[in-house]
UniProtKB/Swiss-Prot annotation:
Catalytic activity, reaction form: 1-heptadecanoyl-2-(5Z,8Z,11Z,14Z-eicosatetraenoyl)-sn-glycero-3-phosphoserine + H2O = 1-heptadecanoyl-sn-glycero-3-phosphoserine + (5Z,8Z,11Z,14Z)-eicosatetraenoate + H(+); 1-hexadecanoyl-2-(9Z-octadecenoyl)-sn-glycero-3-phospho-L-serine + H2O = 1-hexadecanoyl-sn-glycero-3-phospho-L-serine + (9Z)-octadecenoate + H(+); 1-octadecanoyl-2-(9Z,12Z-octadecadienoyl)-sn-glycero-3-phosphoserine + H2O = 1-octadecanoyl-sn-glycero-3-phosphoserine + (9Z,12Z)-octadecadienoate + H(+); 1-heptadecanoyl-2-(5Z,8Z,11Z,14Z-eicosatetraenoyl)-sn-glycero-3-phosphocholine + H2O = 1-heptadecanoyl-sn-glycero-3-phosphocholine + (5Z,8Z,11Z,14Z)-eicosatetraenoate + H(+)
GO cellular component, one term: membrane
Name the record gives this protein: Phosphatidylserine lipase ABHD16A
Cytoplasmic side: 114-558
Domain AB hydrolase-1: from-to ranges: 281-407
Taxonomic source organism: Homo sapiens
MF (Gene Ontology): monoacylglycerol lipase activity; phospholipase activity
GO biological process: monoacylglycerol catabolic process; phosphatidylserine catabolic process; prostaglandin catabolic process
Activity-pH behavior: Optimum pH is 7.2-8.0.
Length: 558
């Protein structure tokens, strides 16, 4: 009877992975009392085959889930319509509640029938036995056997806790349950006294901004968190997970962040290969509709690196909602997991981000300054210009206030706090992070990210002449035009390198540098062009084109 109840309440099983010979336990090693033998690919098909009763009951419950999601998103309009028609009176609500209660009872009955169907299936009984054994005892053998199954991630046991590192238990400087530290925007009116009257005046605007951010704004910014989109992408995500596990020997893990969100991760270890880049770990930060199953992790994987991918809060197996604070909390536990559980030193970690993933990448580089390098692909400096691009001009004040208070993705500000090597990849046909049209390459916000980085690190070089010539170089729409501008100013790379190395040897590596202070205008132009070319590479493609492995290059450093 207990097993039947477990089948009724158990998670949905999607797939049974092919077990690799290298992962099977040696015959000489005795099993623990709670260990259960996992199925081999020779006995069962790798795709879970539900019985007819479970299959039909699952279809009914999945349809009910879709209808509930549609009802949730349309509820404001539905309530408004019902109110206008007078259907929200007590005489109308009571019968409706009876219908809703009856429907819930019917769905509970369908769930019980699904449980009976699972109970009669030896594949599911084997799986639920392993899952229960792992929850009782998270031994390496039990976790190895559980990794052979792909199921609803909510039931996956937690593999790593944000407080697990001993240094955080002893130190009071780490993150609290409220979250890690973020850079906050400065008040808009610094000279105005923050009196009670001013607070009351601002209250309607603050309430409006909060409602916009938590309804329309968050879903527009992170469409991958919308349940209906995830439901449509589920077959593709399952195929992507199967490829990472079966072909790349990936290991899935659940991390618990300081805010209570559970973060879905996938780790591919290449340290045992002959390729030297396998000793480096690339932590990948996906875009606003990207998932590690089908996202930018493929680029460093093809290049031979060890890779750690993770999903934003609210994406696929990760819980929560993707607001900046939750995003930073998730990134924090991912980096801690890489260092304290996977055993990588910060000097062996590379942060790689695509598009909106630049926020968590720059936060990690700012908070963990010892990481080896950072690569930002198709990213931007600040969210406000891009948000204003897609909203009406009459909403400018509301949009700016909402972004600054609730969705402040200040990539450039965080990037300037990082002292290590940085490479920016600008897509010359980008249709997402341009503020006008894709053909207008100067409206690409990657330009502003580069300029802010160089102006912070080399303020004397990027004054007047240097800034002007870098803008000319950024206007080039082809490699031929770039080379023409570079050769026009007769940039001597050996001279530029010697100047920078001499300054570093005398003053140290910490930015900002005052190099160029006593330099001629021609020298500043040469140095500015040299630095711009080293920090930004062009890729002739649109925003969502996968980055080829040959374009995944380590950033330049002295």
């Amino acid at each position: 009877m207990a097993k039947l109840l477990s089948c009724v309440l158990g998670p949905r099983l999607y797939k049974i992975y092919r077990e690799r010979d290298s992962e099977r336990a040696p015959a000489s090693v005795p099993e623990t009392p709670t260990a259960v033998t996992a199925p081999h690919s020779s006995s069962w098909d790798t795709y879970y085959q539900p019985r007819a009763l479970e299959k039909h009951a699952d279809s009914i419950l999945a349809l009910a889930s879709v209808f509930w999601s549609i009802s949730y998103y349309s509820s404001p309009f539905a309530f408004f319509y019902l109110y206008r028609k007078g259907y929200l009176s007590l005489s109308k609500v009571v019968p409706f509640s009876h219908y809703a209660g009856t429907l819930l009872l019917l769905l509970a009955g369908v769930a019980c029938l699904r449980g009976i169907g699972r109970w009669t299936n030896p594949q599911y009984r084997q799986f639920i036995t392993i899952l229960e054994a792992t929850h009782r005892n998270q031994s390496s053998e039990n976790k190895r056997q559980l990794a052979n199954y792909n199921f609803d991630f909510r039931s996956w046991p937690v593999d790593f806790h944000w407080e697990e590192p001993s240094s955080r238990k002893e130190s009071r400087g780490g993150p609290s349950r409220r979250g890690v530290a973020l850079l906050r925007p400065e008040p808009l009116h610094r000279g105005t006294a923050d009196t009670l009257l001013n607070r009351v005046k601002k209250l309607p605007c603050q309430i409006t901004s909060y409602l916009v951010a938590h309804t329309l704004g968050r879903r527009m910014l992170y469409p991958g968190s919308v349940y209906l989109l995830q439901k449509a992408l589920m077959p593709v995500l399952l195929q992507g997970q199967a490829r990472l596990v079966e072909e790349c020997n990936g290991r899935r893990a659940k991390l618990l962040a300081c805010d209570g969100n559970e973060i879905d991760t996938m780790f591919v270890d290449r340290r045992g290969t002959a390729e030297p880049q396998g000793q480096k770990l690339v932590i990948c930060c996906e875009g606003n509709a990207g998932f590690y199953e089908v996202g930018c992790v493929s680029t460093p994987l093809e290049a031979g690196y060890s890779v750690l991918g993770w999903n934003h809060p609210g994406f696929a197996g990760s819980t929560g909602v993707p607001f900046p604070q939750n995003e930073a909390n998730a990134m924090d536990v991912v980096v801690q997991f890489a260092i304290h559980r996977l055993g990588f030193q910060p000097q062996d970690i590379i942060i790689y981000a695509w598009s909106i993933g630049g926020f968590t990448a720059t936060w990690a580089a700012m908070s963990y300054p010892d990481v080896s390098a950072m690569i930002l692909d198709a990213s931007f400096d600040d969210l406000v210009p891009l948000a204003l691009k897609v909203m009406p001009d009459s909403w400018r004040g509301l949009v700016t206030r909402t972004v600054r208070q609730h969705l402040n993705l200040n990539n450039a500000e965080q990037l300037c706090r990082y002292q290590g090597p940085v490479l920016l990849i600008r897509r010359t046909k980008d249709e997402i992070i341009t503020t006008t049209v894709p053909e207008d390459i100067m409206s690409n916000r990657g330009n502003d990210l580069l300029l802010k980085l160089l102006q912070h690190r080399y303020p004397r070089v990027m004054a007047e002449e240097g800034l002007r010539v870098v803008r000319q170089w950024l206007e080039a729409s082809s490699q031929l035009e770039e080379a023409s501008i570079y050769s026009r100013w007769e940039v001597e790379e050996d001279w530029c390198l010697s100047v920078l190395r001499s300054y570093q040897a005398e003053h140290g590596p910490d930015f900002p540098w005052s190099v160029g202070e006593d330099m001629s205008a021609d020298g500043r132009r040469q140095l500015a062009l040299f630095l711009a070319r080293k920090h930004l590479h062009n890729f002739e493609a649109t925003h969502c084109t996968p980055l080829p492995a040959q374009n995944f290059q380590m950033p330049w450093h002295l």
